[in-house]
Amino acid sequence: MRNYFTFIGLLFLFVFSSFSQENWELLKSVETGKILAWDVDPMSKVIYAKNDALIKLDTSFNVQFTQSVKGFGAVTKIDARHSLKTLIFSEDQQSVAFIDNTLTFHKGIKDLSLLNVSYATNVSYSAQSNRYWVFDDDNSKLLLVDENRRAPQVIENLQGTLGSLSLFQLLEMENVLLIFDRTLGIYLFDIYGSMIDFIETSEAKSIHFADGRLYYMTDDELVRINIKNRNVVRIPLPEKDLVSFRVLGRYIFFQTPTHIKKYFLKKVR
């Protein structure tokens, strides 16, 4: 009987592994070593921060541009959704800056303390390249900063609305603002600050949003949820020990402890 269950277990692992590989095609891979932050722009070009430099890869994963950030500080967030104007954030220095498509700094460095931010832990671009979100952890508030206006829009007392909050990832995509707490789940807000949904999960490691679908990654699966009808698709991951991911159409970019990889996701239900 023990041999029977061992056989069934091995058969399951074989089928799971085969199904995983059938869904994915590895297209590109680059060794990065340990990196601080990364993102992918709409042209499928990867930008990542390592040590005191920003590095941009072309679509063949060859180095296209590099830029020193010694004067800016350690980059802890890169948001490259606007291909001509990428946002970078340094938690240590409490500052944001913008770089163009050659990694050249654009209009200097923004000191977040000038916006009455006590301590920011995360930022996110908005749909418009002149606006971005800042999460002030000390005061549990969100600020929507508009470069064309003097004062930011402020959403106060998130702790009172959501309870105990440990924000891990902040992301605005397609007019949906996502607040990801690894211990509780994913909160979805509209751009005016009203909560519209909550996805409970304690297994998610990283999230993304594309084409009306919320994606989150666990140790073993990429989970895709249609926000309108709550249809859920679970896709076995192509490999183990993945750290984070980005979605660009049918292309999924993964960060491992030492590499960034680009996969093509074959059609799933």
Description of each model-found segment:
Residues 1-26:
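Bacterial Sec-dependent N-terminal signal peptides
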Residues 22-31, 62-68, 105-114, 150-162, ...:
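A short beta-strand motif characteristic of beta-propeller blades
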Residues 28-52:
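Beta-strand-rich domains and repeat architectures in extracellular enzymes and scaffolds
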Residues 33-40, 72-80, 117-124, 163-172, ...:
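Repeated scaffold domains used in trafficking and secretory/extracellular systems
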Residues 47-51, 87-92, 134-138, 176-183, ...:
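Conserved beta-strand positions in repeat-built beta-propeller and related beta-rich domains
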Residues 55-56, 95-97, 141-143, 186-188, ...:
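WD40 beta-propeller blade core
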Residues 63-104:
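Mid-chain, structured segments of secreted extracytoplasmic proteins
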Residues 243-269:
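Blade-level signature of beta-propeller repeat domains, shared across WD40, Kelch, NHL, RCC1
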